[in-house]
Amino acid sequence: MKKKGYAVTAYHLKTVPDSLYLTKQIKHKVCCSPSDTFDAKKVAQKFGVELKIIHVENVFRETIIKYFINEYKRGRTPNPCFFCNDWIKFGVLLERIIQDGNDYVASGHYALLRDGKLYKAKNKEKDQSYFLASIKREKLGYLVFPNGEYNKDEIRNIAKDLNIHIHSKEDSQDLCFIPDNNIYGFLKENGVGFKEGLIIDTKGNILGTHKGLSNYTIGQRKIGIAVRERMYVLRKDFEKNLLVVGKKGEVFNNKFTVSKLNFLQDVYKKIEGYVKVRKKFKEVKCRVYVDNDNLYVETREPIFAITPGQIAVIYDEDGAVIVSGVIEKEGWNGFESFN
């Protein structure tokens, strides 16, 4: 951005207290850690850029962490990084940056912006448009994603040529607020119950005992029972405290319902496009009906482990995001036809 002639101010987020990293063992690289703050200061100093450290620990706790805990209490599998982009990075932080008199916000995310639309990055393996699809449409005009035209190796080589010390730094992998990656321990500390119950198959046969429904997600294979065939989590019955498992073929579905919608393009009643339901899943051709603030999605081929709480992003044929939302349930439950 400096090469293009912009006056640059750097901003660095602190989402959790530094003390957390002193009490928890860091299993993998996470963002927003004390080492990241050190690196941000060093890079800003190298290029003579003012660095502002923005503390959002309280609002992060009240929004992202509470959402994460509450979703598990509901038996769902949340996606905190998706909502962090909307509520924190391009919410609280964006507002602060604009209030400070800046015109644009440039971030290192891998995505493209063209003609007011959010597109997948040139480097499809590192593409982050899936997580960025939560950003409100009216905010896209403030954003710049310089990395979107490059792949990761090209960015690392540019950083190396500029003698930036973090050119070979590993990517962030785990949640910043659970640096030891012990999700079970974190949830237990925060009041999520883990009441044991029965594991059954679709015919009602008892196969074993589960360790609390919040400990499992749809499609999970390692469920701690000895059976001849591989079994996968199909659903969680919270009323009866039952974990229902089945064969792999039973985990696939081609219809599901999506709510809490964020539109990045004008949409009418019907959409033809491609849907992605997990970051590492491929997009699947689909048709979508919009009705009463919900999407009713039907895919051309069945998708493995459609999981309530996870995110569905619909793309057009050019790779631009049309709409995103939260997966509520498999099936359509009352909505039966596109006609």
Curated annotation (Swiss-Prot):
A GO cellular component term found in this entry reads: cytoplasm
Q: Which reaction does it catalyse?
A: S-sulfanyl-L-cysteinyl-[protein] + uridine(34) in tRNA + AH2 + ATP = 2-thiouridine(34) in tRNA + L-cysteinyl-[protein] + A + AMP + diphosphate + H(+)
Q: Which InterPro entries match?
A: MnmA-like, MnmA-like_C, MnmA-like_central, MnmA-like_central_sf, Rossmann-like_a/b/a_fold
Active site residues of this protein: C84, C176
UniProt signal peptide: none
Q: Which GO terms describe its molecular function?
A: ATP binding; tRNA binding; tRNA-uridine 2-sulfurtransferase activity
**Region of interest (Interaction with tRNA), ranges:** 126-128
Q: Where in the cell is it found?
A: Cytoplasm
Task: Indicate whether tRNA-binding appears among the record's keywords.
Answer: yes
Keyword line: ATP-binding, Cytoplasm, Disulfide bond, Nucleotide-binding, RNA-binding, Transferase, tRNA processing, tRNA-binding
Q: Which cysteines are joined by disulfide bonds?
A: C84-C176
Q: Which coarse location class applies to the principal site listed for this UniProt protein? A: cytoplasm
User: Which residues are marked as site: Interaction with tRNA?
Assistant: H109, Q310
> What broad class of enzyme is this?
transferase
Record-linked Pfam families: tRNA_Me_trans, tRNA_Me_trans_C, tRNA_Me_trans_M
A biological process (GO) of this protein is:
tRNA wobble position uridine thiolation
Give the residues the record marks as binding ATP.
L13, G108
Which EC number(s) are documented for this chain?
A: 2.8.1.13
Asked if the Swiss-Prot or TrEMBL record annotates the protein with the keyword tRNA processing, the reply is: yes
Role, per record: Catalyzes the 2-thiolation of uridine at the wobble position (U34) of tRNA, leading to the formation of s(2)U34.
Query: What NCBIfam families does the database record attribute to this sequence?
Result: PRK00143.1, trmU
According to its UniProt record, which protein family does this protein belong to? Belongs to the MnmA/TRMU family.
PANTHER family of this UniProt entry? Answer: MITOCHONDRIAL TRNA-SPECIFIC 2-THIOURIDYLASE 1, TRNA 5-METHYLAMINOMETHYL-2-THIOURIDYLATE -METHYLTRANSFERASE
Can you name this protein? tRNA-specific 2-thiouridylase MnmA
